[in-house]
Amino acid sequence: MTNTQTRVIKQINKTILATCSFIFLFGFFLSSATSTILIQTNEWSILTAAILISIVELFNYLKHKFQFNDRKSGYNCFFFINLAKLGLLYGLFIDAFKLGS
């Protein structure tokens, strides 16, 4: 590999890392916004949890139904949605610890 190719690959890797970090933190933000806005009244808490779990399980079903072994065009979409899902679940997990303490 030439020096130019190495620099291009390093720049692409930095861009991918920044994009993945942004999407994960966006999922974390969604969990904070969801728990702050929709769960202010006690009537919405069970419905909100059921909807979020349904969305996560639907995504898991679709991901395992269309398993992407190679890097097709749909792979990146599922990868980024999975990162947002992980951020969402991590944020809800952290909120549960905050409520428990």
Swiss-Prot record:
It comes from the Eukaryota. GO terms for cellular component: chloroplast. Its main location: plastid. It holds the Pfam family DUF565. The keyword Cell division does not apply. It is found in: Plastid, Chloroplast. Keywords: Chloroplast, Plastid. Belongs to the ycf20 family. This is Uncharacterized protein ycf20. It comes from Cyanidium caldarium. The gene is ycf20.
